[in-house]
Amino acid sequence: MIEIGDIVAWDCPYEETTIHGIVTDIIHIGGRIIAVNFGNYQDLIFDEVKLRKIA
Protein backbone atom coordinates (compact mmCIF):
# COMPACT_ATOMS: atom_id res chain seq x y z
CA MET A 1 0.00 0.00 0.00
CA ILE A 2 1.31 3.44 -0.93
CA GLU A 3 1.78 5.90 1.96
CA ILE A 4 2.91 9.53 2.29
CA GLY A 5 6.69 9.80 1.84
CA ASP A 6 7.01 6.74 -0.42
CA ILE A 7 8.96 6.93 -3.66
CA VAL A 8 6.75 5.94 -6.59
CA ALA A 9 7.19 5.44 -10.33
CA TRP A 10 4.84 6.59 -13.08
CA ASP A 11 5.11 5.46 -16.70
CA CYS A 12 4.61 8.73 -18.59
CA PRO A 13 2.70 8.05 -21.83
CA TYR A 14 3.80 11.37 -23.38
CA GLU A 15 7.57 10.98 -22.97
CA GLU A 16 7.60 7.15 -23.08
CA THR A 17 9.74 7.08 -19.95
CA THR A 18 9.39 6.32 -16.24
CA ILE A 19 9.36 9.25 -13.83
CA HIS A 20 10.00 8.92 -10.07
CA GLY A 21 8.48 11.11 -7.38
CA ILE A 22 7.54 11.35 -3.71
CA VAL A 23 3.99 10.95 -2.39
CA THR A 24 2.92 14.18 -0.66
CA ASP A 25 -0.77 13.55 0.07
CA ILE A 26 -3.42 10.83 -0.06
CA ILE A 27 -7.09 11.71 -0.45
CA HIS A 28 -9.96 9.24 0.05
CA ILE A 29 -12.82 10.07 -2.36
CA GLY A 30 -14.48 6.79 -3.30
CA GLY A 31 -10.95 5.40 -3.66
CA ARG A 32 -7.41 6.54 -3.05
CA ILE A 33 -6.29 9.65 -4.93
CA ILE A 34 -2.57 10.31 -4.57
CA ALA A 35 -0.63 13.58 -4.96
CA VAL A 36 2.96 13.11 -6.16
CA ASN A 37 5.77 15.65 -6.47
CA PHE A 38 8.32 14.94 -9.22
CA GLY A 39 10.80 17.62 -8.16
CA ASN A 40 9.04 20.70 -9.47
CA TYR A 41 6.90 23.23 -7.62
CA GLN A 42 3.49 21.54 -8.10
CA ASP A 43 2.05 18.13 -7.30
CA LEU A 44 0.32 15.90 -9.85
CA ILE A 45 -2.78 13.91 -8.90
CA PHE A 46 -3.12 10.19 -9.74
CA ASP A 47 -5.38 7.23 -9.16
CA GLU A 48 -3.48 4.63 -7.12
CA VAL A 49 -3.49 2.04 -9.95
CA LYS A 50 -1.29 4.26 -12.18
CA LEU A 51 1.61 4.31 -9.71
CA ARG A 52 4.17 1.71 -8.63
CA LYS A 53 5.76 1.82 -5.17
CA ILE A 54 9.57 1.82 -5.35
CA ALA A 55 10.59 2.46 -1.72
Q: What feature does the model see in each segment?
A:
Residues 4-52:
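Basic/aromatic-rich interaction segments and small domains that mediate binding to polyanionic partners
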